[in-house]
Design a protein with these regions (language model features):
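Substrate-binding cleft of secreted/luminal carbohydrate-active enzymes
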Residues: 284-310, 326-413
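The substrate-binding groove and active-site-proximal loops of carbohydrate-active enzymes
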Residues: 35-48, 87-107, 159-177, 219-233, ...
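Active-site-adjacent "subsite" loops/lids of carbohydrate-active enzymes
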Residues: 23, 31, 35-52, 115, ...
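N-terminal structural segment of carbohydrate-active enzymes
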Residues: 14-79, 173
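Hydrophobic faces of well-ordered beta-strands that scaffold small-molecule active sites
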Residues: 26-30, 69-71, 124-126, 192-194, ...
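Active-site clefts of carbohydrate-active enzymes
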Residues: 30-32, 249-275, 317, 321-362
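Aromatic-lined carbohydrate-binding/catalytic grooves of carbohydrate-active enzymes
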Residues: 64-104
Length: 413
């Protein structure tokens, strides 16, 4: 495959005026695991403070002409919404199925967020992690006693220090479909969203413990890697059907690790990168198949690298993904958290990474997205980094890049 490349620098080309007003996704991830973004630790168990914090974020996004959030509601097989299937999240109330400060469930965070976001013209893409049961410093002892983890221990495996659903089991796929169906049925969400955590990132010297499952349920496969990819393919295909059968207008999006495969691994389809992780080979996520089959509506690769990075160049990857969309939408994940406002730390950055000590790296990437012609917007991770206005990023968005509001590219009902 020939990789498209810009013939002129994104900084030297003029952005067409229409690019500022045409449909463009302008999103931000709101991470709840380990209280990364919301609620803050000060607001754990405090419904009033949680609501105030959410309103502050949404008001800021509205003022900056953002039009989408990706709200994490199931970070560790738990719920930041009212659920009969999984426990109230410890990140919301302090421990799984814990009590609020007043002893009641005073509000439904997902319902509240949908209502308040939609008032402001902001879409809500609901973010779930499919297989992770512990994370963010959790241990087995933090899992609620009535969790499905204890009701069906045969569904779970331990890898490293963490626990996961076993992706090779039909029962696990059904459980995940039931969780998603419950959300789609009961909430006015605009999309279901998964990130890069399918099979977990590899641990050196340790194999994911599913050999017995493979031996018991090979489904015609004789290669465990192909079988694992098929496990992930099956759940994506089934979730697509689960969502669309209920509400055809609700979209299904994936935000994968930024490299599908390196060109040295796959000379015909790989990107000109030298990444240490590859979706297809390490996370068993065949994103291109999902796009080709129409199982997902958009892809938001996490391109958290700078323009010009030798092993994973933002521009090369932007162009690669834009040439492998199969007619679906591309929203690029960008990384405000990598901007370095501390002058002393910025001075220590080496090579192309020096870009993160400059105020314009994210702005350059947004301009490059627009010039690409096939990219329909970006999503920023995480929202708290954006809110901190690193190197004046918020100011640049407000006065220049996001000066005018934009409709979303989302297919409406």
């Amino acid at each position: 495959m020939v990789i498209a490349a810009s013939t002129l620098s994104a900084e030297t080309q003029r952005i067409p005026e229409e690019a500022l007003t045409q449909p463009e996704m302008r999103g931000a991830w709101i991470a709840t695991v380990a209280n990364i973004d919301w609620p803050t630790k000060a607001a754990i168990g405090d419904a009033d403070l949680q609501q105030k914090e959410m309103i502050t974020m949404l008001d800021t996004l509205q003022a900056l002409h953002f039009n989408m959030i990706v709200f994490q509601v199931r970070p560790t097989a738990d719920a930041l919404y009212q659920s009969k299937m999984e426990p109230v999240s410890s990140w919301l109330v302090g421990k799984q199925n814990g009590m609020w400060t007043d002893g009641t469930m005073p509000y439904d965070p997902l319902e509240f967020t949908c209502n308040e976001a939609h008032k402001r013209g902001i879409e809500v893409h609901v973010w779930l992690n499919p297989y992770r049961v512990t994370g963010g410093g959790m241990t087995k002892g933090d899992i609620a006693a009535d969790h499905v983890f204890y009701q069906h221990p045969e569904w779970f495996v331990k890898y490293g220090k963490q626990y996961y659903f076993n992706p090779g089991l039909d029962e696990v796929r059904q459980w995940l479909n039931d969780v998603v169906a419950d959300i789609v049925d009961r909430y006015e969400v605009d999309a279901i969203h998964f990130d890069d955590y399918f099979y977990p990132y590899r641990i050196a010297g340790e194999e994911f413990p599913d050999a017995e499952t493979f031996a018991a349920y090979p489904r015609g496969f004789d290669n465990i890697d192909d079988w694992r990819r098929n496990n992930t393919n099956l759940v994506i295909e089934e979730l697509h059907r689960t969502i669309k059968d209920r509400k055809p207008w609700v979209e299904f999006g994936i935000s994968p690790f930024g490299v599908w495969r390196n060109i040295t691994t796959d000379p015909e389809r790989g990107s000109k990168t030298k990444a240490g992780v590859q979706n297809y080979d390490d996370l068993y996520a065949d994103i291109l198949l999902w796009l080709e089959m129409g199982w997902i509506d958009y892809v938001a690769p996490q391109l958290y690298w700078e323009i010009g990075k030798q092993v994973a160049d933002y521009e090369i990857l932007l162009n690669w993904w834009s040439e492998n969309l199969y007619g679906k939408k591309l929203y690029v994940g960008v990384a405000p958290y990598r901007l370095e406002p501390n002058a002393e730390k910025a001075a220590k950055l080496k090579g192309t990474a020096k870009a993160w000590g400059q105020p314009n790296e994210i702005c350059r990437q947004i301009r490059m997205n627009r010039l690409n012609g096939k990219c329909s917007g970006c999503i920023m991770y995480p929202i708290h980094s954006l809110m901190e206005n690193p190197l004046g990023l918020k100011d640049s968005l407000r006065t220049t890049l996001f000066r005018e509001p934009a409709e979303t590219p989302t297919t409406k009902k």
